[in-house]
Amino acid sequence: MTELPDNTRWQLWIVAFGFFMQSLDTTIVNTALPSMAKSLGESPLHMHMVVVSYVLTVAVMLPASGWLADKIGVRNIFFAAIVLFTLGSLFCALSGTLNQLVLARVLQGVGGAMMVPVGRLTVMKIVPRAQYMAAMTFVTLPGQIGPLLGPALGGVLVEYASWHWIFLINIPVGIVGAMATFMLMPNYTIETRRFDLPGFLLLAIGMAVLTLALDGSKSMGISPWTLAGLAAGGAAAILLYLFHAKKNSGALFSLRLFRTPTFSLGLLGSFAGRIGSGMLPFMTPVFLQIGLGFSPFHAGLMMIPMVLGSMGMKRIVVQIVNRFGYRRVLVATTLGLALVSLLFMSVALLGWYYLLPLVLLLQGMVNSARFSSMNTLTLKDLPDTLASSGNSLLSMIMQLSMSIGVTIAGMLLGMFGQQHIGIDSSATHHVFMYTWLCMAVIIALPAIIFARVPNDTQQNMVISRRKRSL
C-alpha cells in the first residue's frame, strides 16, 4: 500500500467510504424501527417493509451494476451511486408516511446496489495485481466496522435526537464522497457485450412480484385472488427467464453454472439458509425494544456482541472447514443457529438479561461460520470462465433471500400479534415466543439440503479452488 501513488491511495479512500456508508445503513435502521413506527403512526408489525424495500432493490439492481460500470465508466457510476444513495437518505429523513419512506429506501437501494460491486471493480482497475489483496483488505475494513457501529449509533441517535438522523448523517459524507469521486477517480471503461435487458427485466419482475405476493395481504390489504395472480405472474417470469437463458448464449446468468454440483447445492442452501438467518438482525432489536422494553440505545448495544462474534469467527472458519469438511460444518452450524436462537428467546423471557450478550456473541459466531462456508462451497468449484457470473448470482440470491426472510418475519409477527402488541406485556411475550419457534424451524430446515454435500475434506478445501473449463 505504501508504494502506491498518492492519487491511487485517495481513490482507495473514496471506495472505502462508499463501503462504509452502505454497510452502516444495513444495521443502523433496524434499531430505529419501533421509533419510526411511533413517529409515522404505524404499527411496528408493518415496519419490516422499510428493510425489505432496500434489500430487495439491491438484489434487483446488482446484476446491472458491473455492466453499467464497464459501459459508462467506474467514476461516473460510482459518482451516481453516491448521489442516489445520498438523495435517498435525504428523502428518507423527510418522509412523513411509511409509503414515502419505503419509496425513499428504494432510491437508496439503487445507489447501494451499485456502490459496493463498482467499488470492487475500481480497485481491480487502479491497483497492480500484486497489491490487490492488500488494497481490498484496506477498502473492506470500513465495511466491517459499519455493521459494528450501526446498532449502537442508531440507538444513540434515536434516543437522544430522532430517527431522522440515522439518514441525515449520510448526507455530509455523501457530499464529500461525491465531490472526491468526481475530482480524483479515473473513468475507466472497457468494451463489453450487449446487456441482457430482457433477462434482467424478467428476473427483476419475478423477484419483486413474488416478494410482494408473500406479504401483500398483511401490509397492503391486497385480496387473496390478486395475491394468487401476483404469485403466478412472478413464478411465470422466473420460468420465462430460464427458457430465455437456455436459448440465449448472452444471458444475464448462464445455465451452465448449474452443471457444477457444488454450485447448485450451495446456491440452493444459501437461498434457504439466508431466509432464516436474515430474520435475526431485523427481529432481535425489535424484540428487545417492544418485547422487553429496552431503550433504543440499550437494544443497539446488545447487537454489538453479535457483530463481534461474526468478525472474530472469520479468522478461524477456514481451518474448521478444512478439518471437518463442508457437510459437517454446514449441518452443525445450521442446527446450532436454530438452537442458539431458541436459547436467546428462552434467556430473554426468563429475565436473565446478563446472559444475552454471551448468547448473541455465540449466535454471531455460528452465523458467520455458516455464511463463510456457504459462500465458499457455492463458488469453489466453478470454472474460471464462470466465476464472475456465479459470484454475481450468489450476491443477488443473498440479498433476495434476506428480503424474503424479513418479509416472513413480519408476516409471522402480524399473524400471531393480530396487529396489536404492547410494550413488554405477557401477550407480547407470547407473540414473540411463537414467532421465534417458527423462525427456529425455518432456520433448521436447510440442514436437509446441506446433508447432501460431499464431506471429503481434501476435495472441499477452502484455500484452493480447482481450475476447470467446460
From Swiss-Prot:
Spans within the Cytoplasmic topological domain: 33-48, 98-101, 159-164, 218-224, 284-285, 363-395, 452-470
InterPro entries: MFS, MFS_dom, MFS_trans_sf, Multi-R_MdtD
Gene: mdtD
Stated family: Belongs to the major facilitator superfamily. TCR/Tet family.
Organism: Salmonella newport (strain SL254)
Gene Ontology cellular component annotations, sorted alphabetically: plasma membrane
Subcellular location: Cell inner membrane
Residues in the signal sequence: none
Membrane topology field: Multi-pass membrane protein
Protein name, UniProt field: Putative multidrug resistance protein MdtD
Gene Ontology MF terms in the entry: transmembrane transporter activity
Residues in compartment: Periplasmic: 1-11, 70-76, 125-137, 186-196, 246-262, 307-341, 417-430
CDD domains named in the record: MFS_LmrB_MDR_like
